[in-house]
Amino acid sequence: MYGGAEIDRRLRWTIAAEVRRTGRFNTESAVAFAAGGVLRVESFPEPIGLSPVRRHTAELLRVSLSEDTVTAELLARYHRVSREHAITRGDMKPDWLVDSEPARHPRGWRYPAGAATRALAHARENPGAVVTGWAAAALLGIPEFSDGADTQLLTRSRSRGPDDPQEPRLIRPRNPVEAWQARHRGLAVAVVPPMYALGTCVREALSGRHAWDVPAIPGLAGERVRAVQVIDRFRRVFVLSAADVREGCAGLVHNRELAKALKLSDPSADSGWETLTPLIVDPIVRGHGIALRSQIRLGEDGSPVGPDEPCMTVLDLGSVEFRVAVYYDGGNHLERRRRDRDAKITASLLAAGRMVLRVSAGMVRDTGDLVRRFTALCESAAGRPRAG
């Protein structure tokens, strides 16, 4: 029996209150919340109906709909994502990302269209269905892990499929689920609430039914690492406690497996990559007697400040006592203005006696190099005088 309904109702009120107060809520750019708790899904490619495109193409070519030239023109300009919808080829995911998916998919399929785009197409073709699983996570503002997953819909009909990449998996739930309503350019689509999406995604990550690339971490199975990444993102976006996760996943995830994943969870991690670094380096850090915390606020003089005080920077990971500062630098840190700001902050921290390490996604993939860098950092930090 699904146990997260009460938390989902609380989240709806929390989100609505935050939107009324500030005009926004803490989600990814793909989703905004209206004051009533309705999602407005905006910033990903819209699936295009094939029938009007085919008619328009035939008119432009001045041929009948059945002509092979119409099909050839469609194939040149569009990629089909479902039985009745397509996207322009310019809206397809990068080739390197699409090519990486078959190795992880149980049937070796690839999905050139993103999960949210496919979800909208399948929802339009299946009136009354509710988007669930990884596609629901994407619509709820957590798209990072979803693109290579099959679209899943809750439906009153029997469970089946998919038989090919253009079909969704239809699931008949044992118990009814109260859906949230999303809107994309005025069209409504039903989506499962956050806690139900979390539970189903964690279950599939732990079972290995859906997977994505993660580095090998000694002592941790890839399935558990992925489950921790998913939990961290939901906790960060929807501000969930460990107790919320336990309650919300009741009936969907085995208690013992969930407890093991929660023990490794960091609710302050801003991305899946930020989840990985502590998992990789934790044995080294603990071996040197150093405890690292996430999201540490520092003032202009490099000393810690409270949540309501002005701050110069927020450490992604660090130790006040051992004067360690760690940052995760994503692609946005390559911008000139951001690089200048990062350099200024690094110089200020070094002047304040802190040791600074900036970690990129490429460094996380090379676990051996990351371990060596953290070992050197910890050895230096442990041998220095501690902060008073």
Predicted regions and their residues:
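Surface segments flanking catalytic/ligand-binding clefts of nucleic-acid enzymes
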Residues: 29-32, 37, 43-44, 52, ...
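Short gly/ser-rich loop at a beta-strand->alpha-helix junction or flexible surface loop bordering the NTP-binding
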Residues: 1-253, 388
